[in-house]
């Protein structure tokens, strides 16, 4: 990633959509139509994946953390709880052109 005279968060200024995925004992997903989005784990540590099922060995986001993600095309976000506590993966889509 390169940063040129801009703040890292400059491209994530204008939220345009909100999604959520229940992260429980089985994989759940939501289609995200934006290519710039954030994910936030609420209530539990969560395993997530983009475009394929979340498993015990896919990407990890700790409880109450927020990650900003940019992908080349719209995708599905898949979620699964990391341990025995259910949680929710909150997703905010951003307009990349504003």
Regions found by a protein language model. Name each.
Residues 1-18, 93-98:
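Short, intrinsically disordered N-terminal pre-domain segments
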Residues 15-34, 56:
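Surface-exposed ligand/attachment interfaces on beta-rich extracellular proteins
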Residues 35-37, 71-86:
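Noncatalytic modules at the cell exterior or secretory-pathway interfaces
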Residues 40-57:
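Short, surface-exposed beta-strand/strand-loop-strand elements in extracellular ectodomains
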Residues 41, 50, 81, 91-93:
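Residue-level recognition of conserved beta-strand positions in structured domain cores
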Residues 46, 85-95:
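Edge beta-strands of jelly-roll/beta-sandwich modules across compartments, strongly enriched
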Residues 52-54, 83, 97:
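Solvent-exposed strand-loop boundary residues in beta-sheet-rich modules
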Residues 62-74:
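Beta-sandwich interaction modules
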């Amino acid at each position: 990633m390169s940063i040129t005279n801009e703040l890292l968060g400059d491209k994530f200024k204008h939220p345009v959509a909100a999604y959520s995925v229940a992260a429980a004992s089985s994989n759940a997903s939501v289609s995200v139509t934006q290519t710039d989005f954030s994910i936030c784990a609420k209530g539990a540590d969560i395993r997530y994946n983009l475009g394929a099922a979340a498993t015990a060995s896919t990407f990890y986001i700790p409880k109450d953390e927020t990650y900003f993600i940019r992908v080349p095309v719209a995708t599905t976000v898949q979620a699964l709880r990391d341990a025995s506590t259910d949680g929710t993966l909150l997703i905010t889509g951003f307009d990349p052109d504003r």
